[in-house]
């Protein structure tokens, strides 16, 4: 879509160099531009603002997602220099600040998949819950209680607002803090289901996920895996989990969530544990 939108201002060669996808979150569009085209970034931004009628702000992502809060550097190219927006998904409304919190619209199908897994009456711990999108969608679809933990105070503040917007006070509980510390102090053996939505640190936090999960409960273990063949990625993730887990585990399923680089994939392994 991005290449088609910009075909009037870029040559065929330039268009071929362009990263084809962009993220639209509410009224905000975030694009990545290769070094060879940064001299034209303002033109690209202005053209997108003109062509995409629902957009009010075009930002250039000038860094990868990084740091303790998993944020990215953004540069305004066109429109309003405003990073907070409203995002809608699965009948829910969310306030998101794209500069100060981590959020990806590309995980919508995974959010629905997790919500469909949840049973009425369950308690779920979302260890890296951000602004609460996974948690709120699950609580909206099923009668469950979700503890949404995040170390980023901006995310925790927005999560509390999103809980109120979606009228889920008491169903989703926003907790600010390090997931391991929160679980140790408050949530040991509390969850029927635990989400580990920080794939780059899942191995580090697996013991905490197990601590929070009741015997017979389910852990959704996300990771980044290298695979020469895409078809091998999910199976390699299963093997890795089984090598590192300290508890008896039954694999319920696994899948690729999305590619994240050449021969690298974000995967999820769904496991039932016994303690």
Question: Which residues are covered by each model-predicted region?
Answer:
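SAM-dependent transferase fold signal centered on methyltransferase-like domains
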Residues: 1-275
């Amino acid at each position: 879509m991005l290449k088609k939108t910009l075909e009037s201002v870029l040559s065929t060669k330039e268009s071929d160099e362009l990263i084809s996808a962009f993220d639209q979150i509410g009224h905000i569009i975030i694009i990545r531009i290769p070094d060879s085209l940064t001299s034209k970034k303002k033109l690209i931004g202005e053209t997108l603002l003109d062509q995409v009628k629902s957009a009010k702000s075009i930002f250039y992502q000038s860094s990868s997602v990084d740091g303790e809060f998993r944020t990215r550097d953004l540069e305004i190219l066109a429109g309003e220099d405003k990073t907070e927006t409203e995002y809608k998904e699965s009948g829910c409304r969310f306030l998101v600040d794209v500069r100060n919190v981590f959020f990806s619209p590309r995980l919508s199908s995974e959010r629905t998949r997790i919500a469909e897994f949840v049973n009425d009456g369950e308690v779920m711990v979302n260890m890296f819950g951000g602004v609460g999108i996974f948690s709120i969608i699950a609580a909206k679809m099923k009668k469950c209680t979700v503890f949404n933990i995040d170390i980023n105070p901006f995310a925790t503040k927005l999560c509390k607002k999103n809980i109120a917007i979606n009228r889920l006070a008491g169903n989703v509980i926003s907790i600010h803090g390090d997931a391991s510390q929160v679980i140790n102090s408050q949530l040991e053996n509390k969850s029927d289901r635990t989400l580990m939505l920080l794939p780059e640190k899942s191995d580090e936090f697996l013991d905490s996920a197990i601590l929070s999960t009741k015997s017979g409960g389910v852990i959704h273990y996300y990771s980044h895996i290298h695979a020469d063949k895409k078809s091998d990625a999910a199976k390699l993730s299963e093997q890795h989990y089984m090598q590192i887990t300290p508890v008896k585990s039954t694999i319920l399923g696994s899948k690729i969530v999305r590619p994240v680089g050449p021969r690298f994939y974000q995967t999820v392994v769904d496991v039932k544990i016994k303690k």
